[in-house]
């Protein structure tokens, strides 16, 4: 994958379900098209926001096929594939139909809490097992481990097909440390919508966004203004969206974004798979209120 294609806004696509809890491929197709038409620079399917832990292997293949058909070559597609048993993950990636897949977003090994050396060996083994580009995903709030900047830099230097990192540690100092010492082609992306402006000021080159599902045109505009160093204009958009960005996580992700998409009529059903549940009534009311404020301006 051309690393320059990661600059800008990628959308962490939700996985819509129907009233029976099955994948709603029609809503998925329409939503993927909505992202591309709205200015998303690339699509990320089957990540955290896509409820990947609850998706069966056969469903993954069908979801990817639907996304491929909807995108129709108009932008890159990145697919989430992570795990905490390296050998199993290697086998899974090797068996995956990667037709039309430009890169893999792979979350740090979770729950068993490896050391930094274990994290390094895990990702190096993945990188050596495939020619597909790999993007590291650091989200310690979910995994229980932080990929320290030193480990990221080792991987960026030692593994040519590890092309970037989605940084969702919330740690601006860590982002700064990576940016200062990384090899030139390695790309740093924000994993938090509300920190994107701050991260880009430190040298990050984009975001993998949740709020972009609902407002691709508006949030893409914010990100590209930041990349053009037009931060005052970007801050105006950020202030407009910051309340909604907060609400997306009050009841966990993707409960918030699915509620918003349902209210906007972009998905037909507001269904999550257990143990995740839909946003509470109070959160839904707040989302409706803030949505009205955003869309009236």
Swiss-Prot record:
Record keyword Amino-acid biosynthesis present: yes
Asked if Amino-acid biosynthesis is a keyword of the record, the answer is yes
One of the record's GO cellular component terms? cytosol
Q: Where is the active site?
A: 137 (proton donor/acceptor), 166 (schiff-base intermediate with substrate)
Q: What is its EC number?
A: 4.3.3.7
Subcellular localization is given as:
Cytoplasm
Q: Can you supply a Gene Ontology BP term from the record?
A: lysine biosynthetic process via diaminopimelate
Pathway this chain belongs to: Amino-acid biosynthesis; L-lysine biosynthesis via DAP pathway; (S)-tetrahydrodipicolinate from L-aspartate: step 3/4
Supply the alphabetized keyword list. Answer: Amino-acid biosynthesis, Cytoplasm, Diaminopimelate biosynthesis, Lyase, Lysine biosynthesis, Schiff base
Protein's recorded name: 4-hydroxy-tetrahydrodipicolinate synthase
Organism, as annotated: Porphyromonas gingivalis (strain ATCC 33277 / DSM 20709 / CIP 103683 / JCM 12257 / NCTC 11834 / 2561)
Q: What is the lineage of its organism?
A: Bacteria, Pseudomonadati, Bacteroidota, Bacteroidia, Bacteroidales
């Amino acid at each position: 994958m051309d690393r320059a294609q990661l600059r800008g806004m990628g959308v962490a696509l939700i996985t819509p379900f129907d009233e029976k809890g099955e994948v709603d491929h029609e809503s998925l197709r329409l939503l993927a098209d909505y992202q591309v038409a709205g200015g998303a620079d690339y699509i990320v399917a089957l990540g955290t926001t896509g409820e990947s832990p609850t998706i069966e292997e056969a469903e993954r293949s069908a979801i990817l096929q639907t996304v491929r058909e909807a995108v129709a070559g108009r932008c890159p597609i990145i697919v989430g594939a992570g795990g905490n048993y390296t050998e199993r993950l290697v086998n899974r990636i090797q068996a995956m139909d990667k037709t039309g897949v430009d890169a893999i977003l792979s979350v740090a090994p979770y729950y068993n809490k490896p050391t930094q050396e274990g994290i390094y060996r895990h990702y190096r083994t993945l990188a050596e097992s495939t020619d597909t580009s790999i993007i590291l995903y650091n989200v310690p709030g979910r995994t229980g481990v932080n990929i320290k900047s030193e480990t990221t830099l080792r991987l960026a230097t030692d593994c040519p097909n590890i092309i970037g990192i989605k940084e969702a540690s919330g740690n601006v100092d860590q982002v700064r440390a990576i940016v200062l010492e990384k090899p030139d082609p390695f790309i740093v992306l924000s994993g938090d919508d509300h920190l994107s402006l701050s991260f880009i000021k430190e040298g990050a080159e984009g975001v993998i966004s949740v709020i972009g599902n609902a407002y691709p045109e508006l949030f893409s505009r914010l990100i590209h203004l930041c990349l053009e160093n037009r931060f005052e204009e970007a801050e105006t958009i950020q202030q407009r969206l910051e309340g909604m960005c907060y609400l997306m996580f009050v009841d966990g992700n993707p409960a918030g974004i699915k509620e918003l998409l349902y209210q906007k009529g972009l998905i037909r059903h507001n269904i999550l798979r257990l143990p995740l549940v839909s946003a509470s009534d109070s959160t839904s009311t707040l989302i409706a209120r803030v949505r009205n404020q955003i869309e009236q301006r």
